[in-house]
């Protein structure tokens, strides 16, 4: 041991550094499970890597460096204008209208890059997976169109076909899917 202490405050001046075991990180004077892609955000603001009974999951972490999370609610068959309204007005237990938005193209790219991990978390939470893994769209198969918040110079809305990661744009009146996102 590098110090003999009767309580933590007595040790603070004696211990120069300490580390956590793998899968955990420091949080003040203790440790918590490390936040990772696919971790769950609960309505009380806590984050966990496992499903916790009697807690409500409201989001899944998409990217830790940009602190991006996506809703568990994937809204279907909205045109581009409806998608914007849906995302701006979206609420969950513990969040309010205006705290969510439609994803940018960069956000959709992060979702696509981490789709396998996110699908595992969605599936474990009892939610449909991204891109029709559980429900094949009759028109798009498993290459669903997900709207972004971005428009082109020609008035079309930018989107990503999540099956293959194709970036494209479509008439704003066409149907598609949207995923509200927020920073955590």
Can you annotate each of these PLM segments?
Residues 13-22, 31-33:
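Extracellular cysteine-rich, disulfide-stabilized repeat modules
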Residues 84-99, 105-169, 181-183:
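An exposed tryptophan-centered "aromatic clamp" motif
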Residues 5-10:
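Tandem-repeat/low-complexity and Cys-motif detector
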Residues 34-100, 144-146, 155-159, 175-181:
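Extracellular adhesion/carbohydrate-recognition regions
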Residues 1-3:
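Small-residue (G/S/T/A) turn/hinge positions that recur once per unit in extracellular repeat modules
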Residues 170-174:
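Extracellular carbohydrate recognition
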